[in-house]
Amino acid sequence: MESVASLPKTKIVRHELFLILLLASIQFTNIMDFMIMFPLQDYFLKQFQIDTAMFSLVLSSYSFAAAIAALIGANFIDRFNRKSAAIFLYVGFLVGTALCAVANTYSFLLFARITAGIFGGMISGVILSIIGDVFPMEKRGKAMGGVMGAFSAASVLGVPSGIRIAMTSGWNYTFAFIVVLGLPILVLAILYLPSLPSKMEKQKVADFSQLINVLSKRDHLVALAFFMSVILGGFTVVTSIAVFMERNMGFSKTQVSHIYEIGGICTFVSSWIVGFLSDKFGKHKVFLILVLLALLPILAITHLPKDLPVYMALGVTTVFMVLVSGRVIPSMAMLTSAIRPEVRGSFMSVNSSLQSVATGIGALLAGAILIQLPNGTFERFDIVGYFAVGFNLLALYLSRKVKIVS
């Protein structure tokens, strides 16, 4: 745990801010590519004449491709310059997204999503490794908060823009827009990403010792379990919020979109604040406070009365998004600091893989618990909330076991 009194100056200088914004821009396009699939579902169902089960296969194919790629990538990602790895993966991601833009059959779209998932799933791990390598511990919270702001920006700016493009020009153009947006980001990455050579000795490509090294250490397993519990503590509820608010609370689709727009704006601001507080008061302490505070909106949102006014319900969802997403910032800073630089890329690739698995488990768990009534509403959302509380308490316990080494 950090000693706050001994922390040096934590001010982010200009070139560091530019790097944070560049990494956040890469994440923005990556997250937008994933998130835009949900509101575009109706377009796919109609054009390809598929049912919801086949559409869920498109979604899960991305997640599982990302998980497998991240796990395999853990074997060799630390053998390459961080900049070279980031550029290669981002090019592959843009190619996969471009394939989505020209997809005209269901099978081709499935192939395109798998391609995007393979590269997109590894980008996050490399970006987080760059933060861990470039920023010292006392600045890592701010840097992580800035990059995490990409999720909020994707919710507020990316997804609504993608929907409008789909409405006016067609869903293919939404993916084309992401590619066009990503090209200048790619150029900036080539020009300005710092060169971070591998700290490892040359090894055979087929050598799996790095993956074994990551998974064989107890401290690594504790850190991985810690972050999986953090993700499960949010995603068990997040995956069902929209349908619950629409079916049970009577929200219109426009009002449902307000959940993400308002919540995204607030989390964009709060992510920087949480990062600052994490650096000033310590990651463990801020994480503890945020988890305890987050339990309140988790229980509130899963127990909302049907006659609650819309503005009050939106207030609950906004507080939920701010606090639940806020937990991730200090937890991610703790995670990157629990790994030595020479294996950080491999570890973060494994973590990205398990993060994809955790999001899938959270969705499956919520789906198994919820019961749809004949009138279309859902029951047992409260039980989903109790599971989320349990995962958060587990994360709180495991956070005390995470050892800071770098």
Identify the meaning behind each predicted range.
Residues 4-13, 194-224:
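Juxtamembrane intracellular "pre-TM" segments in multi-pass secondary transporters
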Residues 49, 81, 102-108, 250, ...:
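Helix-breaking motifs and short loop linkers at transmembrane-helix boundaries and internal kinks
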Residues 68-107:
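Conserved MFS/SLC helix-loop-helix module at the cytosolic interface between two early adjacent transmembrane helices
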